[in-house]
């Protein structure tokens, strides 16, 4: 019979780092609220949630790398909002942030949940920050809780 590994939605005892971008703060603050809410609802101690604020989304991977390298965190949540404008800047930033966060997680072995919105409009970002499409910060936190527990069960 095969053996299955699954992560529980229990954040008790988990120490979580959150890296959140200040740019587009009217969106990212909602994502942050959602993430903290999810962590606390699932048993995390607020004292074990550490938040690093970075200027923009491009700086998220470096701060996440520093947190991961510290060995102090069970997981990290990356939160930001990159909204398409009239120049190719959106494409460069969203691509590099995505690649950077994935690289940090794979290289460090620390789970990093990607809660960086990459939307075509402000309206889409608002929808994903707690209105019509839920709160992607909340979802990122739930994902990281489950992933931490999954990896623990594999070990």
From Swiss-Prot:
Gene Ontology MF terms in the entry: 6,7-dimethyl-8-ribityllumazine synthase activity
Name of the coding gene: ribH
Protein source organism: Pelobacter propionicus (strain DSM 2379 / NBRC 103807 / OttBd1)
Name of protein: 6,7-dimethyl-8-ribityllumazine synthase
EC id: 2.5.1.78
Catalytic activity, reaction form: (2S)-2-hydroxy-3-oxobutyl phosphate + 5-amino-6-(D-ribitylamino)uracil = 6,7-dimethyl-8-(1-D-ribityl)lumazine + phosphate + 2 H2O + H(+)
GO BP annotations listed: riboflavin biosynthetic process
Active site (UniProt): 89 (proton donor)
Record family assignment: Belongs to the DMRL synthase family.
């Amino acid at each position: 019979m095969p053996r299955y590994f699954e992560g529980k939605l229990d954040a008790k005892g988990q120490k979580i780092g959150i890296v959140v971008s200040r740019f587009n703060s009217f969106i990212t603050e909602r994502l942050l609220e959602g993430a903290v809410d999810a962590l606390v609802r699932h048993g995390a101690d607020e004292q074990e949630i550490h938040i690093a604020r970075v200027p923009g989304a491009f700086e998220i991977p470096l701060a996440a790398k520093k947190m991961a390298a510290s060995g102090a965190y069970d997981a990290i949540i990356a939160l930001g909002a990159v909204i398409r404008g009239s120049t190719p800047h959106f494409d460069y930033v969203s691509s590099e942030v995505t690649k950077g966060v994935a690289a940090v997680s794979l290289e460090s072995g620390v789970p990093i949940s990607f809660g960086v919105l990459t939307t075509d409009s402000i309206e889409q970002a608002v929808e994903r920050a707690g209105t019509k499409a839920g709160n992607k910060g909340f979802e990122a936190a739930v994902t990281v809780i489950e992933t931490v527990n999954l990896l623990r069960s594999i070990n």
